[in-house]
Amino acid sequence: MIGMPPPHFSLERQILSYYESGQEAERLESPFFRWEKVRTLDLLERLLPPAPALILDVGGAAGAYAFPLAEKGYVVDLIDPVPSHIEQAQKRAAMGQRVPRSFHVGDARAIPCDNGVADAVLFFGPLYHLTDSGERMKAICEARRVLRAGGVLLAVAISRFASALDGITRGLIRDPDFVRIVQQDLKTGQHRNETGNLDYFTTAFFHHPDELKTELIEGGFPNPRLCAIEGPLWALPESATAEQQEGFMAIMRKLENEVTLIGASAHIMGIATKPND
């Protein structure tokens, strides 16, 4: 149950400007990034409890995953800190039938929901846009609060090595300004783009895989496991037949839990279950 409006939190200006520009919707539909969405949907199908479980999609943008889940019979509450994302989702919902139950402007650090009601919480954004570790811990503890015992948190991080690998794959590494961004990413995990080039992303924190696991444990989720989302698939050519794509997916399912390869994935999913207290 969605409750009273939470305390006010604000996104950093650069992050809000990036998403208000419509970059996220365009990115997920672009050929180069398609594997992120395809693989995420594949993982959700395998990791979520059966419908009609209640899912809180926190930081879910305009509903890239909330709508497909609602179509499968899940009860989905979509929460995002970017007002235009919620407006886009509401417009889309007006044209559909099986759509998310509710849409709210809100923040992962103060989820507008009662204690212990959610079967699953999706964090597909909050952990990399909360650049301070204390703020990330607030969000993780909030996820634990709203989950029922046995509920699952699926929390996505961007890999510490994502910019370096992206730069090599797409040739961005030829730009000295991009090289400087990569150097800071590798040193501190703090991704800062002062170039004005939106292709270089926006303000974020890039996790080392071990950091993601540690944060989940410290937030009250014992024994989390990590899973590579795209893995090496993001380096594949843009065109592939349906048969080839299925072959790629079968390989990735074999590689997704390989510890030595998880950091080579642009996105890493932390899978954590709330214990019985």
Predicted regions and their residues:
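Conserved class I S-adenosyl-L-methionine
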Residues: 2-51, 64, 68, 96, 152-185
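Class I SAM-dependent methyltransferase SAM/SAH-binding core
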Residues: 56, 64-110
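A short acidic, Gly/Pro-enriched loop at the edge of an enzyme's catalytic core
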Residues: 109-121
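A short SAM/SAH-binding and catalytic strip from SAM-dependent methyltransferases
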Residues: 119-134
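Acceptor-substrate binding/catalytic loop of class I
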Residues: 130, 196-210
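A short glycine-rich, Lys/Arg-flanked "PGG" loop and its adjoining helix->strand segment in the class I
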Residues: 137-149
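C-terminal lobe and adjacent flexible extensions of AdoMet/dcAdoMet transferase-like proteins
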Residues: 215, 219-277
